[in-house]
């Protein structure tokens, strides 16, 4: 998947590269698409919509196109969602640029935890690692730091590509 947004096109789009090599628009009309993450079975794409200050949920049909796209999580405050990751149980972890926080949501979108970044307000990305995959690494671009928080639940292990 590719995404594109900017001054030349304020409505943002996400493109997909099909197995036959053709590139087509997966979804358009998105106010600043940013972080993208697929659920474990790759049937749902979550999209951090920075300018809308929300996260969209896009179920993917068998033909590879989205269906019934809508707001999954509405955030508040300055900035908006940026990078994301998944917990092992299908919850969503969202870096909130402009608020200096990372939010951990249940698979149903309920807020479970808030991790505050003490070094700045521009938390931009997240990734799991460490023992039992419970360490959450957070990039904070205002200060240039990489922070680590130990969570009570593990992150989804990413498949290793060979």
List where the protein language model places each region.
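Short loop/turn segments immediately following beta-strands, especially the blade-tip
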Residues: 58-65, 150-159
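Loop/turn-rich, solvent-exposed surfaces of beta-rich toroidal or solenoidal domains
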Residues: 53-69, 73-111
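A short loop-to-beta-strand structural motif that recurs across blades of beta-propeller domains
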Residues: 12-15, 54-56, 101-103, 145-147
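Short loop/turn segments immediately following the C-termini of beta-strands
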Residues: 3-5, 50, 60, 97, ...
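Beta-rich, blade/repeat-based domains predominating
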Residues: 3-4, 8-14, 23-44, 74-92, ...
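Flexible "stalk/tail and boundary" regions
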Residues: 16-20, 103-113, 121-122, 128-130, ...
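Short, structured loop/turn "capping" segments at alpha-beta junctions
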Residues: 8, 21-26, 45, 52-55, ...
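Beta-propeller fold detector
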Residues: 24-28, 66-74, 113-116, 157-162
